[in-house]
């Protein structure tokens, strides 16, 4: 068994996997990696099953010390990672020698990085997943939903010898301001015509009041003209519009039901891009039909089949 000791951490550093499924009828949310694409690539670099537990590091402030020689993988944001002061770029596997320190300093490009280990980090499964949901006290190293803390030990049982990189063609360019695809929802026709124009033709700024439950988009207030709604199930990526007219994108740790009208839901690929945006960043929304969104999603999944 190989071990890493956490030397520094923040409440935003969490153990995550693909999340919990089949439990929303119990009032339990999904959880899981906010940028599932990057987590999958981190696992792919080590030949892991793509949904194995990895460390989600948001905005930096995380450091580990290797207790034995090991080979790990890093994908996602550039958070100024360093090995004993030497810069380490993401989208590759790398060797960390016994006693060496891997440290994440600050965001240089993107918001979330994913650190994976051969065979995945050891953690108990709660309702079929190790994903950490702090609000629900589920998942994580102890199964109680706690963030990673200084002094804790990360262990794993696998071993990999080959160092490799994610092909350049498959790495997302986090500098691009790609529109976020939105599958239209049932209440879309109950917003004013001007609001529908503004939704897709105006920029939206990410509010600093953001967490793993949701991100508020700041811009022109939208006007809902329909009747009050009865609460209903909320899918991942749902874009709700509360009475103040400022949309909220609901993320992995969202509540399971809600009663605000919805514009629709962002696609999984759009959510992965949104997860890498810092507060204050501007985004645009683009309407897409479900068939197109599904086809693009399936095509993206084919990328992980490369050897």
Residue ranges and their predicted role:
Residues 1-307:
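Conserved "landmark" site that anchors the functional core of diverse proteins
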